[in-house]
């Protein structure tokens, strides 16, 4: 929603250019700022419904300058809130998860991201199942420096906030066109955004979008995948004021796309996943 109106992101010639990377990263900063402040188990915390309000998104979008980085993205004040209701989050999320994307021969689509958190979870075994260590997805700091309650603070019976983002994109006829998702802890959001922009805006097929260099920002520096040759366009961002940092960004994107009645699959080369069909 935040990046849709920007022409600098649209079309094949925009692929991985500095202006496009900057706009995407700035939108991600704003999104993470709101997510970290407001998102938690809705059974315990009233999540603001106005986070996706068009007028609110318009105001947030005005904070994005195509060729300039913001110093720090602050959470907004969505409609219905008189003040920023929750404190500064202190959650640390471990990268580890599994993604399955399916379209069957009748056109039914399924995207599932599953996790037990770290590799082998808590390392405890019960009747053939490994138990998770999902408590690490909570903030263990219940209040911030100002004494304001943190939305994602740990509590009995509460579900931890997750970054999992299994995604199904529907076409104009309501039929699934893209089914995707990824493991990767709190960076899952960056990987899914990269894949969707790559396919929808830059015209990449499912495999090329999955293999595309990972990048983005969670509110801090602009992260660029260190396991691939660093893009010069990323270094251009320093002139915009972005602090560019090479990082380990091990995605596991699995995508199925419907193109002209044909299904194409893309499996992230960074992990063991494969694309298969009958």
Give, region by region, the residue ranges found by the protein language model.
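Extended C-terminal subregions enriched in glycine
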Residues: 21, 106, 157-160, 192, ...
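A short acidic/small-residue loop/turn micro-motif
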Residues: 117-119, 184-185, 220
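Short Pro/Gly-enriched beta-strand edge/turn motifs at strand-loop
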Residues: 77-87, 144-154, 238-240
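Active-site rim segments in enzyme catalytic domains, especially the processed small/beta chain
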Residues: 103, 108-178, 202, 206
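Alpha-helical support elements that line or immediately flank enzyme active sites
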Residues: 2, 181-204
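Internal maturation/activation junctions in enzymes
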Residues: 5-115, 125-126, 243, 268
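Low-complexity, Gly/Ser/Thr/Pro-rich intrinsically disordered linker/tail segments
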Residues: 262-278
């Amino acid at each position: 929603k935040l990046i849709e109106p920007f022409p600098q992101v649209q079309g094949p010639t925009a692929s991985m250019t500095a202006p496009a990377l900057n706009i995407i990263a700035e939108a991600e900063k704003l999104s993470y700022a709101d997510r970290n402040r407001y998102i938690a188990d809705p059974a315990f915390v009233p999540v603001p419904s106005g986070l996706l309000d068009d007028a609110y998104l318009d105001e947030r979008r005005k904070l994005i300058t195509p060729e300039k980085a913001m110093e720090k993205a602050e959470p907004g004040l969505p409609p219905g809130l008189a003040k920023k209701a929750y404190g500064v989050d202190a959650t640390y999320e471990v990268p580890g998860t599994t993604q399955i994307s399916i379209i069957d021969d009748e056109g039914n689509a399924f995207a599932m991201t599953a996790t037990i958190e770290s590799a082998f979870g808590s390392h405890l075994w019960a009747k053939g199942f490994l138990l998770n260590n999902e408590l690490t997805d909570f903030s263990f700091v219940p209040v911030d420096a100002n004494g304001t309650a943190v939305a994602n603070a740990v509590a009995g019976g509460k579900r931890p906030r997750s970054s999992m983002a299994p995604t199904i994109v529907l076409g104009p006829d309501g039929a699934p066109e893209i089914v995707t998702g990824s493991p990767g802890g709190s960076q899952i959001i960056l990987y899914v955004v990269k894949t969707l922009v790559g396919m929808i805006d830059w015209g990449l097929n499912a495999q090329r979008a999955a293999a595309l260099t990972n990048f983005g920002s969670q509110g801090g520096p602009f992260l660029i995948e260190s396991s691939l040759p660093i893009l010069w366009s990323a270094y251009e961002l320093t002139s915009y004021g972005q602090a560019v940092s090479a990082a380990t960004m091990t995605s596991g994107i699995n995508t199925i796309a419907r193109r002209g009645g044909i299904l194409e699959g893309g499996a992230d080369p960074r992990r063991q996943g494969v694309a298969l069909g009958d």
